[in-house]
Curated annotation (Swiss-Prot):
It comes from Aliivibrio fischeri (strain ATCC 700601 / ES114). It is an enzyme of class 3 (hydrolase). Belongs to the GTP cyclohydrolase I family. InterPro entries: GTP-CH-I_C/QueF, GTP-CH-I_N, GTP_CycHdrlase_I, GTP_CycHdrlase_I_CS, GTP_CycHdrlase_I_dom. Pfam families: GTP_cyclohydroI. SUPFAM superfamilies: Tetrahydrobiopterin biosynthesis enzymes-like. It comes from the Bacteria. Its EC number is 3.5.4.16. This is GTP cyclohydrolase 1. GO terms for biological process: one-carbon metabolic process; tetrahydrobiopterin biosynthetic process; tetrahydrofolate biosynthetic process. GO terms for cellular component: cytoplasm. Pathway: Cofactor biosynthesis; 7,8-dihydroneopterin triphosphate biosynthesis; 7,8-dihydroneopterin triphosphate from GTP: step 1/1. Keywords: GTP-binding, Hydrolase, Metal-binding, Nucleotide-binding, One-carbon metabolism, Zinc. It catalyses: GTP + H2O = 7,8-dihydroneopterin 3'-triphosphate + formate + H(+).
Length: 217
């Protein structure tokens, strides 16, 4: 098992303490073994669906799915993949809102394992620390790369940034299309879901909250 960074451990422990961690159980299975076993099971599933895996279009599909699950769309289940975080001292004494708009994200609904496609806007008020801007995007992506519900994902990003910045003054809003609604069930192709998580001054101060929410495109 890969050793975890200090940032990864801090964020994971903060989420566990708040009951916000994605339901997971460590099984001690290596990445490569996971791929092998997922490939075996996926081969069985596709065969049960009457697909001919000897066809040259399908023969590598179980392998591709296994690799995709472990290395890509579910890579956020492994905190060894938590992004390297750069946090610096706020020597400039910056005290105005920092906002990153329209962070694109693709996640997976944990109920049906189909796509969630959306964007997030993240803001914070610098106190003692400033975080590298690209790190905000990477944190959003990390939590998107696992089976999710949007409400929890929004809270996870909030708590992760609060933990790394040492400040409660963080805000997130997320708008996403859920393909479990769009491509099955009710088959609603136009609706989207918006979730918001506010901390510190964004929750306490109506003016700060309004500045954040009114600036969202």
């Amino acid at each position: 098992m890969s050793s975890l960074s200090e940032s990864a451990i801090l964020v994971r422990d903060a989420l566990v303490a708040r009951g916000l961690e994605t339901p997971m159980k460590e099984n001690g299975v290596s990445r490569e073994e996971k791929k092998e076993r997922i490939e075996e099971h996926m081969r069985e599933i596709l065969t049960l669906l009457s697909l001919d895996l000897s066809d040259d279009s399908l023969e590598e599909t179980p392998h591709r799915i296994a690799k995709m699950y472990v290395d890509e769309i579910f890579s956020g289940l492994d905190y060894a993949n938590f992004p390297k975080i750069t946090v610096i001292e706020n020597k400039m004494n910056c005290d105005e809102m920092v906002r990153v708009n329209d962070i694109t994200l693709t996640s997976t609904c944990e109920h049906h394992l189909v796509t969630i496609d959306g964007k997030a806007t993240v803001a914070y008020i610098p106190r003692g620390k400033i975080i590298g801007l690209s790190k905000i995007n990477r944190i959003v992506r990390f939590f998107a790369q696992r089976p999710q519900v949007q409400e929890r994902m929004t809270q996870q990003i909030l708590v992760a940034l609060q933990t790394l910045l040492g400040s409660d003054d963080v805000a997130i809003t997320m708008e996403a299309t859920h393909y479990c609604v769009k491509s099955r069930g009710v088959m609603d192709a136009t609706s989207s879901t918006t979730t918001t998580a506010l901390g510190g001054i964004f929750k306490r101060n109506p003016a700060t909250r309004h500045e954040f929410l009114s600036g969202i495109r």
